[in-house]
Design a protein with these regions (language model features):
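Primarily recognizes the serine-hydrolase "nucleophile elbow" in alpha/beta-hydrolase
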Residues: 119-184
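Catalytic metal-binding/acid-base residues of hydrolase active sites
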Residues: 71, 100, 180
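N-terminal presequences and immediately downstream first alpha-helices
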Residues: 1-26, 144-145, 174-175
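Catalytic nucleophile-loop/oxyanion-hole region of alpha/beta-hydrolase
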Residues: 75-84, 95-132
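Short beta-strand element of the alpha/beta-hydrolase
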Residues: 60-70
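A fold-wide structural signal in alpha/beta-hydrolase
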Residues: 63, 88-95
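N-terminal cap/lid segment of alpha/beta-hydrolase-fold proteins
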Residues: 12-59
Length: 184
């Protein structure tokens, strides 16, 4: 394990309880409908999983497709569970997605996996009450990079054909927190 992977795994372990296990009094009266570990790509079911979080008893909702960070080599969707509940409390259906970390998965595997997750969202919109006309794509750190890349892929036929992916969802907004971008 590289120092980089060790470092990001340590951050997740140190802050997991603080971020996800505290009693959240502001959510006590809310009834969440959370479905965990849904396989979005059966060819790699151990890695390609997502969670759906929303308020129980609500109709069609705008979607936040959220991608965790972790320095490209670490991280997990479960470390963003409290954030997903917070977004759900605001009236969103949250899709909290995992992808394969480097170096085990090499470019462009993560992009292809995340496009497959978007395909799952589109294919399951009726079942989970996703309003596909109102989709926000977001993430933190490496997840913000992947979210920005998905926005480029969704709007570029050449990138879609190079990756063998065809996300049909267009994003109405982006939620990018401390991502890594090459702006030059």
């Amino acid at each position: 394990m590289s120092f980089h992977t060790f470092f990001f795994n340590a951050i997740d372990k140190i802050y997991y309880r603080r971020q996800n296990c505290r009693r959240e009094t502001r959510f006590e009266d809310l009834d969440f409908d959370i479905v965990r570990d849904i396989v979005y790509d059966p060819s790699d079911g151990a890695t390609c999983r997502l969670d759906v979080c929303r308020l129980r008893g609500t109709g069609s909702l705008p979607v936040i497709f959220y991608i965790h960070g972790g320095g490209f080599e670490a991280g997990d969707k479960h470390c963003r569970a409290a954030l997903a509940r917070w977004f759900a409390a605001l009236g969103y259906a949250v899709v909290n997605v995992n992808y394969g970390p480097a170096p085990r998965y090499r470019f462009p595997a993560q992009h292809v996996q995340l496009c497959a997750a978007l395909g799952w969202v589109q294919g399951n919109a009726a079942k989970y009450g996703f309003d596909l006309s109102r989709v926000i794509c977001g993430g933190d750190s490496a997840g913000a990079y992947y979210a920005a890349a998905l926005a480029c892929i969704a709007d570029n036929g050449e990138l879609q054909s190079r990756l063998g992916a065809s996300p049909c969802i267009k994003f109405g907004a982006m939620l990018l927190n401390c991502g890594v971008y090459d702006m030059v």
